[in-house]
């Protein structure tokens, strides 16, 4: 997967198109990511010991990784991601600027 937890991304399709956020969680087996503050859904929570009131909560739902684009840290623009081997390590590289994303 070309994104990691903590990366800044821009949503390129769906109801939150054009919005930016940081990756909160990656679900590699399902090819999905959870972006902080985006793709919010209503969850009906039954009362329990942790939340005695219960009610309707807003939570972030996972979205497909193909719907997000990584933001290049050097240019603050969305970019595609490539991979290079540097000193025996696999490093993510921005396709637009050609600079390494992993520092």
Curated annotation (Swiss-Prot):
GO terms for biological process: translation. Transmembrane segments: none annotated. GO terms for molecular function: rRNA binding; structural constituent of ribosome. Keywords: Ribonucleoprotein, Ribosomal protein, RNA-binding, rRNA-binding. GO terms for cellular component: ribonucleoprotein complex; ribosome. Pfam families: KOW (PF00467), ribosomal_L24 (PF17136). Disulfide bonds: none annotated. PROSITE patterns: RIBOSOMAL_L24 (PS01108). InterPro entries: KOW, Rib_uL2_dom2, Ribosomal_uL24, Ribosomal_uL24_CS, Ribosomal_uL24_KOW, Translation_prot_SH3-like_sf. The keyword Zinc does not apply. The keyword Ribosomal protein applies. Belongs to the universal ribosomal protein uL24 family. Part of the 50S ribosomal subunit. One of two assembly initiator proteins, it binds directly to the 5'-end of the 23S rRNA, where it nucleates assembly of the 50S subunit. PANTHER family: MITOCHONDRIAL RIBOSOMAL PROTEIN L24. This is Large ribosomal subunit protein uL24. It comes from Pediococcus pentosaceus (strain ATCC 25745 / CCUG 21536 / LMG 10740 / 183-1w). The gene is rplX.
